[in-house]
């Protein structure tokens, strides 16, 4: 059996419970055709780079699959039929990654509390002080005006 990573995008207006039901449905299809589903990661509702079928957001789901090719073809066929699935992509991999995916690591990193001031060696915009290379406008000599008559 071959190893696959499968990502699909579900419409924004379905609930997370309906997304979980889709995952269970596709798990059942894979297992019925002699395959196994390993890790399943729900990346949540994220903004799309561009609109897909009039949707600006989508639920992202990653599945690690160990199944024969006909099982994957059947899942893809059912995803084409289902109106709740906007896009899907299946990629054959040599081995499945251990631990959380890059998207989950990024989410964990973003959820961490920030340090005080974030960068103590740098201040905000207001603490720059006077610029020594530029004087005040009052220090400049005035240009003579030409009288127009």
UniProtKB/Swiss-Prot annotation:
Keyword check for Ribosomal protein: yes
Chain segments carrying region Disordered: 93-149
GO cellular component: cytosolic small ribosomal subunit
UniProt cross-references to CDD domains, sorted A to Z: bS6
Keyword terms of this UniProt record: Ribonucleoprotein, Ribosomal protein, RNA-binding, rRNA-binding
Alphabetical list of Pfam families matching this protein: Ribosomal_S6
Biased composition (Basic and acidic residues): 94-149
Superkingdom classification of source: Bacteria
GO biological process: translation
UniProt keyword RNA-binding present: yes
Molecular function terms from GO: small ribosomal subunit rRNA binding; structural constituent of ribosome
Role this protein plays: Binds together with bS18 to 16S ribosomal RNA.
Family: Belongs to the bacterial ribosomal protein bS6 family.
Protein name according to UniProt: Small ribosomal subunit protein bS6
Organism: Rhizobium meliloti (strain 1021)
Encoding gene per record: rpsF
């Amino acid at each position: 059996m071959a190893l696959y990573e499968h990502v699909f995008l579900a419409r924004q207006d379905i609930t997370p419970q309906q997304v979980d039901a889709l995952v269970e449905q596709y798990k059942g299809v894979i297992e019925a055709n002699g395959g196994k589903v390993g890790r399943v990661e729900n990346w949540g509702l994220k903004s799309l780079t561009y609109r897909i079928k009039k949707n600006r957001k989508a639920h992202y789901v990653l599945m690690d699959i160990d199944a024969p090719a006909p099982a994957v073809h059947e899942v893809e066929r059912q995803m084409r039929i289902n109106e709740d699935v906007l896009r899907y992509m299946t990629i054959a991999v040599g081995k499945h990654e251990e631990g959380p995916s890059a998207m989950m690591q990024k989410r964990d990193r973003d959820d961490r509390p920030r340090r005080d001031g974030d960068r103590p060696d740098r201040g905000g915009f207001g603490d720059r002080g006077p610029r020594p290379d530029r004087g005040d406008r009052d220090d400049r000599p005035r240009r003579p005006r030409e009288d127009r008559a």
